[in-house]
Amino acid sequence: MFGNGQTGQRLPAMASPPHDSYYSQSLASSRSRNNSDAMDIYAITDRDPPAREPSGYSQWYRNGSPSVNSIHSKSSEKQPFYEENGRMYHAYRKGVYMLPCDEQEQDRLDIFHKLFTVARVSDGLMYAPHPRNGRFLDLGCGTGIWAIDVANKYPDAFVVGVDLAPIQPSNHPKNCEFYAPFDFESPWAMGEDSWDLIHLQMGCGSVMGWPNLYRRIFAHLRPGAWFEQVEIDFEPRCDDRPLEGLAIRQWYQYLKQATQDAMRPINHNSRDTIRDLQEAGFTDIDHQMVGLPLNPWHQDEHERKVARWYNLAVSESIESLSMAPFSRIFNWDLDRIRRISSEVKSEAFNKEIHAYNILHIYQARKPAN
């Protein structure tokens, strides 16, 4: 059923896809939801409703790791959020980050966390080798759901999450700490050669310089430790019909252009990612791809389950992804943004349109010597 798309074979979500491995030897040569599966975000994520408030800003020292308290903006702590076009955004380096951070956005991020677990056919949280009592760092942790789940699963581990927006819950495990606002694109020192795994999820659209970020990540990992990155390529693909002229295709082109103009492109290129990881010094790079159908048109039950989750995630994402880029970069009014968002959602719900996106998972190791 899956033919060759623009970037190669589209891999079904229900299968464990083959891996593209790049080893060192080769280097020389709305709150209202209609989907009954997800009516209660706290039920689907298996956690209690958190108090949505910033966590404390305690200093921490462990295995030589310095305090990160100096990166906090005093002005943003006094006025951490501001409203724009009916959505709330964090005020740290106001206007730079394109995504909101209100309750609707926090629910969206938690839905994606669940989606990734379903799509990868595993309840694992980390797929690269790691010690059970290790030090784990989550860059751009969002609501902190991944960090909290890791801390609960590995009570002897030490888990840190950092993010621009202070939206993490205060009722987190004792072995888990959060620091926000924290800009991981600015210079940071959190203990070089000290982390057993660094995790980054959905960074596209937020990062200006991937090569510099990968070099910082490389420096902070222990020798032999791993970096894991999860990204979605939002470019719509379809194997049985062209998408030209459809709103979903036009919307992506607008979003791609706006985020490129803002110098934080949301478009994802796996070849560039692998090249940047290699140039940063990583070896044993593993690349997996998983297909994400936009609606449950497929007959396979697992594929349909993935599609239901992704349909919910996309329906929550279209306006969130569009509002700031289209209003700030293109000066569109709200009516125009909402109109194209509604058209995209309608096509995403249409089972006659067999469109999909691609989930990319990377694992890369810092050499042991």
Curated annotation (Swiss-Prot):
GO biological process: methylation; sporulation resulting in formation of a cellular spore
Chain spans, region Disordered: 1-37
Record keywords, A-Z: Methyltransferase, Nucleus, S-adenosyl-L-methionine, Sporulation, Transcription, Transcription regulation, Transferase, Virulence
InterPro entries noted in UniProt: SAM-dependent_MTases_sf (IPR029063)
Pfam families for the chain: Methyltransf_23 (PF13489)
Reported phenotype of the disruption mutant: Leads to decreased conidial production, loss of sclerotia, and altered in host colonization. Reduces expression of hydrophobins rodA and rodB, resulting in a decrease of colony hydrophobicity. Impairs expression of aflR. Abolishes production of aflatoxin. Leads to down-regulation of nitrate metabolic genes. Prevents metabolization of host cell lipid reserves and is inhibited by oleic acid in growth assays.
A GO CC term assigned to this protein in UniProt: nucleus
Protein location: Nucleus
UniProt biased composition (Low complexity): 20-37
Induction entry: Expression is regulated by the developmental regulators flbB and flbE.
Assembly description: Component of the heterotrimeric velvet complex composed of laeA, veA and velB; VeA acting as a bridging protein between laeA and velB. Interacts directly with veA.
Role this protein plays: Methyltransferase that performs automethylation. No other methyl-accepting substrate has been identified yet. Component of the velvet transcription factor complex that acts as a global regulator for secondary metabolite gene expression. Required for aflR expression and subsequent aflatoxin production. Negatively regulates veA expression. Controls conidiophore and conidial development. Required for hydrophobin production which plays a role in cell surface hydrophobicity and host defense escape.
Protein name, entry field: Secondary metabolism regulator laeA
